[in-house]
């Protein structure tokens, strides 16, 4: 409903979805019939943008463009930031539903701070 109203009234709203691959303790791929949640924005005539949520600069650029659209009176934007949930769903979550070694490898390989330090701003 909020996206529908924002689109109909061309509100300066930026919707951000932190796509972390999990719905509580269930992998996203088993609970949704679309690969990219941002595809759903098109149903409301809202531009959907997919960005690497681990890349600080990519997120900044997507947000900058969405802010420019909003300020120009062009209505809302939906940003899907693809990332990975490193911690459990709640404090004390034993995380029995996923492979801890795989999670640590993903974090090690895609740590946003390491990527930020390795890539100078353009």
Give the residues covered by each predicted segment.
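Glycine-rich ThDP/TPP pyrophosphate-binding loop and its adjacent helix/strand module
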Residues: 1-122
């Amino acid at each position: 409903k909020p996206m529908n109203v924002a689109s109909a009234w061309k509100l300066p709203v930026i919707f951000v979805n932190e796509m972390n691959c999990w719905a509580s303790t269930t992998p996203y791929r088993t609970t949704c019939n679309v690969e990219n949640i941002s595809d759903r924005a098109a149903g409301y005539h809202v531009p959907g943008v997919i960005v690497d949520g681990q890349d600080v600069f990519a997120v900044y650029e997507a947000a900058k463009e969405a802010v420019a659209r909003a300020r120009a009176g062009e209505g809302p934007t939906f940003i899907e930031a693809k990332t990975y949930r490193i911690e459990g769903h709640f404090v004390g979550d034993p995380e029995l539903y996923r492979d801890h070694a795989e999670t640590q490898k993903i974090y090690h390989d895609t740590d946003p701070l390491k990527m930020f330090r390795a890539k100078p701003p353009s």
